[in-house]
Amino acid sequence: MLSGERKEGGSPRFGKLHLPVGLWINSPRKQLAKLGRRWPSAASVKSSSSDTGSRSSEPLPPPPPPPHVELRRVGAVKAAGGASGSRAKRISQLFRGSGAGGAGGPGTPGGAQRWASEKKLPELAAGVAPEPPLPTRAAVPPGVLKIFASGLASGANYKSVLATERSTARELVAEALERYGLTGGRGAGDSGCVDAYALCDALGRPAVGVGGGEWRAEHLRVLADAERPLLVQDLWRARPGWARRFELRGREEARRLEQEAFGAADADGTNAPSWRTQKNRSRAASGGAALASPGPGSGSGTPTGSGGKERSENLSLRRSVSELSLQGRRRRQQERRQQALSMAPGAADAQMVPTDPGDFDQLTQCLIQAPSNRPYFLLLQGYQDAQDFVVYVMTREQHVFGRGGPSSSRGGSPAPYVDTFLNAPDILPRHCTVRAGPEPPAMVRPSRGAPVTHNGCLLLREAELHPGDLLGLGEHFLFMYKDPRSGGSGPARPSWLPARPGAAPPGPGWAFSCRLCGRGLQERGEALAAYLDGREPVLRFRPREEEALLGEIVRAAASGAGDLPPLGPATLLALCVQHSARELELGHLPRLLGRLARLIKEAVWEKIKEIGDRQPENHPEGVPEVPLTPEAVSVELRPLILWMANTTELLSFVQEKVLEMEKEADQEGLSSDPQLCNDLELCDEALALLDEVIMCTFQQSVYYLTKTLYSTLPALLDSNPFTAGAELPGPGAELEAMPPGLRPTLGVFQAALELTSQCELHPDLVSQTFGYLFFFSNASLLNSLMERGQGRPFYQWSRAVQIRTNLDLVLDWLQGAGLGDIATEFFRKLSIAVNLLCVPRTSLLKASWSSLRTDYPTLTPAQLHHLLSHYQLGPGRGPPPAWDPPPAERDAVDTGDIFESFSSHPPLILPLGSSRLRLTGPVTDDALHRELRRLRRLLWDLEQQELPANHRHGPPVASTP
């Protein structure tokens, strides 16, 4: 009966029971919705001295330089003649990442967006070494540049100027002035006129629609005279919603606007716009790169190589006001570093002037300022000191630690996304995930099989992460979590510090106290005693004790021992599921669910066999079958109804946990992980077994209830409610006040209602249980009514009035019990058939077949014709010709079935939504608390049995104040 067979959709399929009616219950397969969302990644470690930009979200490789320009990577630019000239560049590489490629490479997800914290230090140091000159590129065809006058001239908005790859900004300014007529009568090549204007690279938002307003530049950069605008234009593109154009402005005005914009960007700090980044890239790649100011003791900084003479001659022209500000800021930072050196011990005795400019780089790396608006991790112990960084900043709400790895060859699945790369051999590709939203606390979740410790304790499932907590990854890495956004709202002392640091030993008991937390053995014993006797809804166990614990809970529920509340077994089992989902390893929950479902199935099967032995279907010959009374059927079905109620709530609770598992996998990008897929398959099998238990208990319950109703329903057609001296009861009357012929049937309904209420069955299942009982009653009574009218005079007005009265009394009583709507719906066809028979004879003789079909559409043509053809009009009188069906409906009358089918009952639909189990707050039910204490002490005894005899002791008892 509880077969493991399943349909294609995944729902279980049951064999038919030996019922007096055809009972087939289908359960629609419940699908768990998958939700997930991925977070974008972008940020960098703050560095006040960096002038190299971080990569944009869509990096574009710079085009090869013209033949006479030597182009180097931005992160590797080094002034000839002095190492200190590129000091700021190298520091910028360390904290911001160079523009020449990421650690991930082109094939790695986000390879062009990796941060300096994800790179290896040798790769960054290698960027300082000189590189061979890049090969020259092919000639670029001429292009047309639109140069806007930006209010300098009236008339056309822009002028088109022909430019080549060798055209400089100064040459294009001269040509644009000539096109706009701003030369003032002098030649276009007049240097005084050209010097008064500058070509600007502007970024802004275009006007929307017709007449939507003027185009306004929000970011501006003055091109140096020697820069090539045609090459600058090809270096990068504006993001959606932005527009880029070249503008002709007065040189003084352009410098003032650029300086104001640059000052605003400096005030923004790390979050300045990416325009500053693109400005440096454009200037470097188009031949106008500004060289760092020479440091102390360095050479003149004159560039060498191809085109060096030209660049040295135009050096002053290529520097903008913003670049001069950079040089001044670098000098001030260098002075502060020298001042820090002078404050070192022994500075008064010896002059601390480093001869090697690299000493300034090393000192700058030590002067790290932690971010003030993002959580970060402080490295306490690493794997390779030469490659590990000190601060790892969380750039997204979800931060992933791991080793990374190549893309999977099967199915082309991408490599796992990792924010911080750790190269220790025991670090998994995705080791652990930290989620830190706007509100504390943060959550840390280890990946499957990843060794992770939290404040020195092994971490198996998700846990809260507070500022100051220690997070250990593998055997090498140890981090401290910091969140400057909390503003001191976290705990005053980290939980891993001793509780009483520096306190004097209180006495001999100090020798038996814990050195880590500072608690004595007595204090720890009191904490254990508080757990064993506490009312918190927590049940802790080890995996080795799982089988004994689950078996004890199911055995106690099956035997009915104790006075547990109706949903007590489901509550205890849900506590086991919750402990496994929160505390134990990731793969433990599917195994626990499978074992739990099998135990419940076996217990229900044993109970069904016991009831079947006491109520056999086939009785021995000569032994009359004794019908079940409402009281007897209530006693027999109570264990099954209890299991149906508990399994329904447990199923809803387990579905929530499985849905959480899928959501977490989607958020971490592990939805296609083979181990996760295997876990979900095991969970589906466990859910299918619980479905099977619910449907089987429902099937057996309605079987015995309908079996009892089968012997009581005929009285509704035969009994006369108008007996001598009897008064008809009103709505809401008690069962004892009802006519004797109706009491047995109403007694079955009342017993079922009380049983489902006492067992706290889900309201949806209560409605479906009575829906099936009313469906069976309607079909059984209607079939009996059709059958009785064939051989004897039964269809009479007087008999119909008695049946109508009995039916009204039953419906009124069910209305008072809260079941009126369901009863009215399922008794509709019987009510219509009885209403037809209650029509007075004179009125019925005036009706025609078409009018009767219109007034009683629920009856089939065969049923209507059967009632009319056997209606008793009087001795020797037959039905009138007006009652004959037309030829179009004659076939339906002759071939139609007058009996109702029992196989058209509504299917069983399992309840959806959240579970009614409440696992928050203290346990208020005393019986449930006693059972919880008993199970905790059982687990304590199992743990003590594993210890040597001389180490065992009884459960601790909390000391009374």
Swiss-Prot record:
Q: Which residues carry this modification: Omega-N-methylarginine?
A: 96
Instruction: Locate the coiled-coil region(s) and give their ranges.
Output: none
**Where are the residues of the annotated region Disordered?**
1-21, 35-70, 96-116, 261-352
- One Gene Ontology cellular component annotation? protein-containing complex
> What would be an example GO MF term here?
small GTPase binding
Disulfide-linked positions: none
Where expressed (tissues)?
A: Detected in kidney, heart, skeletal muscle, small intestine and lung.
Q: State where composition is biased (Pro residues).
A: 59-68
**Chief location category:** cytoplasm
Ras-associating domain mapped to chain residues: 141-253
| Residue ranges, compositional bias (Basic and acidic residues) | 1-10
InterPro entries linked: CBD_Rasip1/Radil, Dilute_dom, RA_dom, SMAD_FHA_dom_sf, Ubiquitin-like_domsf, Vascular_dev_regulator
GO terms of biological process kind: angiogenesis; branching morphogenesis of an epithelial tube; negative regulation of autophagy; negative regulation of membrane permeability; negative regulation of Rho protein signal transduction; positive regulation of cell population proliferation; positive regulation of integrin activation; regulation of GTPase activity
UniProt entry keywords in alphabetical sequence: Angiogenesis, Cytoplasm, Golgi apparatus, Methylation, Phosphoprotein
Give all Phosphoserine modified positions. Answer: 274, 286, 320, 322, 325, 413
Compositional bias of kind Low complexity: 41-57, 284-295, 314-327
Q: Where is the composition biased (Gly residues)?
A: 98-110, 296-307
**Assembly description:** Interacts with Ras family members that have been activated by GTP binding. Interacts with HRAS, RAP1A, RAP2, RRAS, RAF1 and RRAS2. Interacts with MYH9 and ARHGAP29.
**What is the recorded function of this protein according to its Swiss-Prot or TrEMBL entry?**
Required for the proper formation of vascular structures that develop via both vasculogenesis and angiogenesis. Acts as a critical and vascular-specific regulator of GTPase signaling, cell architecture, and adhesion, which is essential for endothelial cell morphogenesis and blood vessel tubulogenesis. Regulates the activity of Rho GTPases in part by recruiting ARHGAP29 and suppressing RhoA signaling and dampening ROCK and MYH9 activities in endothelial cells. May act as effector for Golgi-bound HRAS and other Ras-like proteins. May promote HRAS-mediated transformation.
**Record protein name field:** Ras-interacting protein 1
Specify the species.
Mus musculus (Mouse)
- List the lineage, top down: Eukaryota, Metazoa, Chordata, Craniata, Vertebrata
